[in-house]
């Protein structure tokens, strides 16, 4: 079982914590959020989860194997960097960071330290996308010459990101997964 802590308990944090708790592969050890009011609910429903440790204490805790970062995009790089430097496996809500150079630095550091760095691109794991990939890989559909993607749900407005980093990244992760190559 992987002992995991979650940083960020705003919009996605509660969903992630719920899913981790329901998994038989994870033990949620702690949840950290700068806003203590956000974590009061979990302290009542799951009293065994430590709440609002300081970030420094959290990454120094040797009983924690991995940390999930579910915070605003502008914080992803620094938090992930500190977690990797502390020897923790890292799960980051998409996007990994706000620039490709920062992303590459995190990837290189994770490789150097032999740690898992996972970005939460969930769509490739949905049954619909897996079925389409199966059809493409089997050549059942023939050669795919064109792929069109339409975003019909804009989600929450993100003040620290743009539509490409926040939403189009879902479509790009699906395309890369389906065709095993970068879109042009």
Q: What is the predicted role of each segment?
A:
Residues 149-159:
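Pol beta-like nucleotidyltransferase catalytic core
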Residues 15, 41, 57, 66, ...:
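Alpha-helical elements of Rossmann-like donor-binding domains used by nucleotide-donor carbohydrate transfer enzymes
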Residues 2, 115, 142-145:
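Nucleotide donor/acceptor-binding cores
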Residues 30, 66, 146:
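Short, Asp-centered acidic motifs that coordinate Mg2+ and/or phosphate
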Residues 125-146, 165-184:
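Oxidoreductase and adenylate-handling cofactor-binding alpha/beta cores
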Residues 1-46, 175-176:
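N-terminal Rossmann-like dinucleotide-binding module
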Residues 48-55:
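Conserved SAM-binding strand-loop segment of SAM-dependent methyltransferases
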Residues 66-73, 77-124:
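Beta-strand-loop-alpha-helix segment that lines the small-molecule cofactor/substrate pocket
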């Amino acid at each position: 079982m992987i002992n995991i802590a979650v940083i960020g308990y705003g919009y996605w944090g509660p969903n992630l914590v719920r899913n981790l708790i329901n998994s038989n592969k994870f033990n949620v050890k702690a949840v950290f959020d700068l806003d203590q009011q956000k974590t009061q609910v979990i302290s009542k429903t799951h009293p065994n989860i430590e709440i609002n440790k300081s970030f420094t204490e959290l990454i120094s805790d040797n009983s924690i194997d991995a940390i999930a970062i579910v915070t605003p995009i502008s914080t992803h790089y620094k938090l992930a960097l500190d977690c990797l430097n502390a020897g923790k496996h890292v799960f980051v809500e998409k996007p990994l960071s706000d620039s490709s150079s920062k992303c590459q630095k995190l990837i290189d550091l994770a490789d150097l330290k032999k740690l898992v760095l996972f970005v939460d691109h969930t769509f490739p794991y949905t049954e619909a996308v897996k079925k389409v990939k199966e059809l493409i890989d089997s050549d059942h559909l023939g050669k795919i010459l064109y792929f069109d993607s339409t975003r019909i749900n804009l989600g929450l407005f993100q003040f620290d990101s743009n539509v490409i980093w926040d939403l189009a990244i879902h479509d790009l992760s699906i395309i890369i997964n389906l065709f095993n190559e970068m879109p042009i």
